[in-house]
Swiss-Prot record:
E.C. numbers: 2.1.-.-
GO MF term list: transferase activity
Protein name, entry field: Putative transferase At1g60990, chloroplastic
Cellular component per GO, a single term: chloroplast
Function of the molecule: Folate-dependent protein involved in Fe/S cluster biogenesis. Functionally complements an E.coli mutant defective in ygfZ.
Pfam families for this protein: GCV_T, GCV_T_C
Subcellular compartments: Plastid, Chloroplast
InterPro entries assigned: GCST_C, GCV_T_N, GcvT/YgfZ/DmdA, GcvT/YgfZ_C, TrmE/GcvT_dom1, YgfZ/GcvT_CS
PANTHER family: AMINOMETHYLTRANSFERASE, GLYCINE CLEAVAGE T-PROTEIN FAMILY
Tissue: Expressed in young leaves (at protein level).
Keyword field contains Plastid: yes
Top EC class for this record: transferase
Length: 432
């Protein structure tokens, strides 16, 4: 396959700015950021692959440019077919639900490493000269302080700071990539388009169908990264990302697994997904489906739309401090956030709950018969034992370790959850 055809088939996210031709050097144009990639060591072995190594590094592009437009992936659902053949359960709308190993996968998250297909999550490409300023004004994070190769979490909120969704952002050379929840992608795109004015140089594009997204999580994630010669990302800040070539296809790897600051996220074309997936499994990653991922989301404490994120709760009650800038100036929801901070207006907070029995989301939380909150998510524990939930509880009513009642007679002990425990209120002079 020649270079031009390969680029067309990859059909990834951005138009390549230019391609440089260097004698006797294998180059791959990166559709993410307009650079050319020289191969970097990526060992592929086991699982039927020939042992081979790829060398990659970024090379500056020349002024001569070739433009590539988006096109459909060459083989629709090739990755999902591979999952189905290997025993994975795939829903009608293309979500990898389970590998009949949920408890094993949850154990691997705690003690080993898992890989989960998050391709059903939304991916939004925001391009144009005004993209950073635009997102700076539309979300809670300080985009104007970020540079190419960095990343962050940011929150989409209403004008009154009520929560819509958490977005994970990668700052690339020619665009900003937003990863959002599956249920909010279209509504966020529609909302953003409403705020683009005539003179704004901003373009919004849904690239979910043109890309695949994997998360690698667990304490042994770094070992796999080292085996694949991607160790230069180990220890880098959350959101830091780099572009590579994998089996002749472009892939972007970022620090953080969406559910945790640890682990990694991998973005690639549909054509490269099978090779990446099989290689990660060959290196020891345990596959995880969306059912186990949802259990993990709840036990880790990451808020989700239509559960913890809704017009019922504001962003400070959700405890998403790492995603909020308090001093970047005017942005949507800023006035409400400022008032809440100034007048100590945060009356409730999101907490974990160790429950004595199963409970339905939406159940009332009480203390001494008085309503103090609401259960928003519930999941059973590993191996059919234990019950856990997330819920909003009034600050003055209960603290970590206190007992509350959920529903009629279910006992719940208020607990700390990892995702929220990592959040830290920014100081007044913070530039974040």
């Amino acid at each position: 396959m020649n270079l031009l055809q390969s680029c067309k088939d990859m059909a990834m996210m951005m138009r390549i700015d230019s391609v440089s031709h260097i004698t006797n050097t294998a180059l791959l144009p990166c559709l993410y950021n307009g650079t050319v990639l020289r191969r970097r060591s990526l060992s592929l072995r086991k699982c039927g692959f020939r042992e081979r190594k790829f060398q990659l590094r970024c090379v500056s592009a020349s002024s001569d440019s070739l433009q590539f437009d988006f096109s459909p992936p060459p083989i629709d659902h090739d990755f999902l077919d591979t999952i189905s053949v290997s025993g994975g359960k795939v829903s009608e709308d293309g979500v990898v639900e389970s590998f009949d190993n949920d408890d094993e996968a949850l154990d691997a998250f705690d003690n080993g490493v898992v890989v989960v297909d998050l391709s059903h999550f939304g991916r939004i490409r925001v391009s144009g000269d005004d993209r950073a300023h635009f997102l700076h004004n539309q979300t809670t994070a300080n985009f104007e302080s970020l540079y190419e190769g960095q990343g962050c979490d940011t929150v989409f909120v209403t004008p009154t700071a009520r929560t819509i969704d958490i977005a994970h952002a990668w700052i690339m050379k020619n665009a900003i990539l937003l990863t959002v929840s599956p249920t909010t992608c279209q509504s966020i795109i529609e909302m953003l388009n409403k705020y683009i004015f005539f003179a704004d140089k901003v373009e919004i594009k849904d690239i979910t169908k043109q890309t695949c997204l994997f998360a690698l999580a667990g304490p042994k994630s770094n070992q796999i990264m080292s085996k694949l010669n991607l160790g230069d990302l180990i220890g880098q800040p959350y959101g830091r990302h780099q572009h590579y070539s994998f089996d002749g296809m472009p892939i972007t790897v970022g620090v953080g697994s969406l559910i945790s600051d640890e682990g990694f996220t991998m973005l690639m074309s549909p054509g490269g997904a099978v090779s990446v997936w099989k290689t990660l499994l060959a290196e020891g990653a345990i596959p995880m489906g969306s059912v186990a991922w949802e259990k993990l989301r709840i036990t880790q404490g990451r808020p989700a739309p239509e559960r913890e994120l809704s017009k019922e709760f504001n962003v400070l009650e959700a405890g998403l401090w790492n995603s909020i800038s308090l001093n970047k100036g005017c942005y949507k929801g800023q006035e409400t956030i400022a008032r809440l901070m100034t007048y100590d207006g945060i009356k409730q907070r999101l907490c974990g709950l160790n429950l004595s029995a199963p409970s339905e989301p939406g159940s009332t939380i009480t203390v001494d018969g008085k309503k103090v909150g609401k259960l928003t998510s519930y999941t059973g524990g590993k191996n059919g034992s234990g019950h856990f939930g997330l819920g909003y509880i009034k600050k003055q009513a209960a603290s970590i370790g206190n007992t509350v009642t959920v529903g009629e007679d279910i006992s719940g002990i208020v607990s700390e959850v990892p995702y929220l425990a990592r959040q830290h209120p920014p100081s007044a002079n913070s530039s974040s």
